[in-house]
Amino acid sequence: MEKKGFTLVELLAAIVILSIITLMGSVGISAAKKGINESLWNNNINLIEAAGESFGTDKKEYIKNLDPSEYSCEIDGQTISPCLTVTVQTLLNRNYLSSKERIEYDDTTDYRVIVNKTIDKAKVIVPADEEANFESGYYVNRVKVYIYVENDIVYAKYSGIIAEK
């Protein structure tokens, strides 16, 4: 008597093997997606800082003449003065930075945003007034950008969260 087909054990083994392969693939895809998001966000930081430098170049004399006792910032543990502090939103409003991503704000305004999708809301403390910043990622429009002049060269430093590791 010839048997045609597979036994139940063979079918279950095939299903288990396919499940393992699928699981391994989805874990790999998830890790790749996280790496891509981190890379994209770090590129966004470079764009924000470049926009800050352009803004600072246009305001170089103004920045150099700021009162150092009133206009200072701390960058990497070092106090720098004079230093002009602006927000990412200022750079967006003055067209030094652009964004295609938009949200509805105050129920009427079409609001341009820069979104950091590497931030896990569960891993950070969110102040009550920032809750709206976590609709689909973290909106960084309120984050400060420090702009200063050193040796007649304009520098800008993004002060927000870089990327989660």
Give, region by region, the residue ranges found by the protein language model.
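Aliphatic-rich helix starts adjacent to a transmembrane/signal segment
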Residues: 19, 25-50
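Short, well-structured alpha-helical interface segments that form or flank functional binding sites
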Residues: 3, 43, 47, 86
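N-terminal alpha-helical signal peptides/signal-anchor transmembrane segments
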Residues: 44-63
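Charged, low-complexity surface patches
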Residues: 10, 37, 79-81
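Short, surface-exposed interaction loops/tails
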Residues: 112-165
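Extracellular/periplasmic head regions of type IV pilus-like filament subunits
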Residues: 63-134
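N-terminal single-pass transmembrane signal-anchor helix
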Residues: 2-29
